[in-house]
Amino acid sequence: MSTVPVVQGAGSSNSAQDISTSSVPLTLQGRISNLLSSTAFKVGLVVMGLLLVMATIFLVSAASFVNPIYLAIPAIVGCVNICVGILSMEGYCSPERWSLCKKVLKASEDIIDDGQINNSNKVFTDERLNAIGGVVESLSRRNSLVDQTQ
């Protein structure tokens, strides 16, 4: 790590007074990008999603008198968290990962809405997931290009 003295021409024995030229301070966007691309954040998304799904299943079974659609919202958010974590785990999304996430989202909605897997989806329909698939594919291509340049 190279340093530049604070006062030009005067060397310093105290490295705290020197300004580092090798490390550029990160902007807010750079720090957020580093956080979002960290493995800990992605694993945290998956864990948070699992916790939301489990909490919703527990609440639906405990509170049968409440409208279950309000309790399904955390589960849907949890499933989306799980899928985002899975899709972004290595920086790109393969077609196999995307098909796995589509199956998870569709099955979780089926189980949450009426307890049976009968393809009665209203939120995660094939049309909506296919539309999202185009966005996922383009983001995946962009992320793989960024990874190749680094």
Swiss-Prot record:
Name the domain of life this protein comes from. Bacteria
Q: Does the keyword S-adenosyl-L-methionine apply?
A: no
Q: How does it sit in the membrane?
A: Multi-pass membrane protein
Would you name any one GO CC term? outer membrane
Task: Write down the species.
Answer: Chlamydia trachomatis
Q: Where is this region: Disordered?
A: 1-20
Keyword list (alphabetical) reads:
Membrane, Transmembrane, Transmembrane helix
Pfam families with a match to the protein in the record: CRPA
Which chain regions cross the lipid bilayer? Answer: 43-63, 69-89
| Name the UniProt record assigns to this protein | Sulfur-rich protein, serovars L1/L3
Cited InterPro entries: CRPA (IPR008436)
Its subcellular locations are: Membrane
